[in-house]
Amino acid sequence: INEEEISLKDGILHHQENVDLLPANIELSALEVTMGNVMSREMIMKEYIDAIRSRYDYILIDCMPSLGMMTINALVSSDSVLIPVQAAYLPVKGLQQLIKTILTVKKRLNRKLAIEGILLTMVDFRTNYARDIASRVHTTYGSQIEVFENVIPMSVKAAETSAEGKSIYMHCPKGKVAEAYKNLTQEVLKNEK
């Protein structure tokens, strides 16, 4: 942003499960304001991602639930987007605006951007509410955008992983969330072919 050269290794953490992470920190929250006057501000992340792309099979960018400049940067940097949405009223309500933003980025900034699909998360199918939300997502978006068959269930074990600094596969490898992520990965890879 300030034209300083950034080392391609700066901030990357190597995890024992053969995954590299570039975690966000508190300074990232001020970045949105700083980016306001930067030329080609939508392309900042793309420059970095393009520089490291050849080192990885896949690069996943996990964005905050916001349509700010960091999310726009992530969309410009990406080949495709998987839209996670909690099985609750307010997140589903914001889905239309997110899809509109994705399509605008595709039209103006990243023509190759594709929507992989919508992933329902924090789903508790024991409740009528979650079943209703899932049904509403399928009805509203299913004809235009794939809604993944696999969903990520509500689970305390999933919430515990952040505090422990472990993946769900190390924390609770035989649990329903680990199984759901494994199945989702297979579904996404199958769709890629």
Short names for language-model regions:
Residues 1-193:
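P-loop NTP-binding core
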